[in-house]
């Protein structure tokens, strides 16, 4: 695939053709969800946020909108949509959910389900000042280019954990966010 020519139609057909295998076992993890917002354009974008530097956890990191599943959420999809509205003012009704990726275990004890959704290009994003310091869009073709990610093995509590690192403009994309983007690339058939 030529990355400069990634169209939304190609992305959608590949995503729907190669449905991810989901293991529904939760292993008593707390549940969380993130929205992977794909901006509907001829050359689609990927919406990301930079977390506020004042947050207790993951301060200043690039992330997808998302958070813990609340008792009021009907599902992980509902949680992802609620969090996206709270963090960057994306109305749930504006999101066309096309599926989910396999859940990812976080270092903070959550099982995080990435929810993939298509959003209109003209939404007026409004960052929640308490949680988000920046909202930016990365071309999806660049985000899914696996060559931009570099591995780093981190040792924590006697275990090795591989994390992925990348830069986009002034933003350092790494950890779970980079791992989810890589998983999305692999899901649509991008070869490492």
From Swiss-Prot:
Domain Nudix hydrolase: start-end pairs: 29-160
Cofactor: Mn(2+); Mg(2+)
Renumbered ranges of motif Nudix box: 67-89
Binding site for Mg(2+): 83, 87
PANTHER family named in the record: MITOCHONDRIAL COENZYME A DIPHOSPHATASE NUDT8, NUDIX HYDROLASE
NCBIfam families in alphabetical order: PRK10707.1
Protein's UniProt name: Uncharacterized Nudix hydrolase NudL
Organism: Escherichia coli O139:H28 (strain E24377A / ETEC)
Gene name of the encoded protein: nudL
């Amino acid at each position: 695939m030529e990355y400069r020519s990634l169209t939304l139609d190609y992305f959608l057909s590949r995503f729907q053709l190669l449905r991810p295998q989901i293991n529904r076992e939760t292993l008593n993890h707390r549940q969380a969800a993130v929205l992977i917002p794909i901006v509907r354009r001829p050359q689609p974008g990927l919406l990301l946020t930079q977390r506020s530097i004042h947050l207790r956890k993951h301060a200043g990191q690039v992330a997808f909108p998302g958070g813990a599943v609340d008792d009021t959420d009907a599902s992980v999809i509902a949680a992802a949509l609620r969090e996206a509205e709270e963090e960057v003012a994306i109305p749930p009704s504006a999101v066309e959910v096309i599926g989910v990726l396999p859940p990812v275990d976080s270092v903070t004890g959550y099982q995080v389900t990435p929810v993939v959704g298509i959003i209109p290009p003209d939404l007026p994003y409004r960052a929640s000042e308490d949680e988000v310091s920046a909202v930016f869009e990365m071309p999806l073709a660049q985000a899914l280019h696996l060559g931009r990610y570099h591995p780093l093995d981190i040792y924590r509590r006697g275990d090795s954990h591989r994390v992925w690192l990348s830069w986009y403009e002034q933003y350092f994309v790494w950890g779970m966010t980079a791992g989810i983007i890589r998983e999305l690339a692999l899901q649509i058939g991008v070869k490492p």
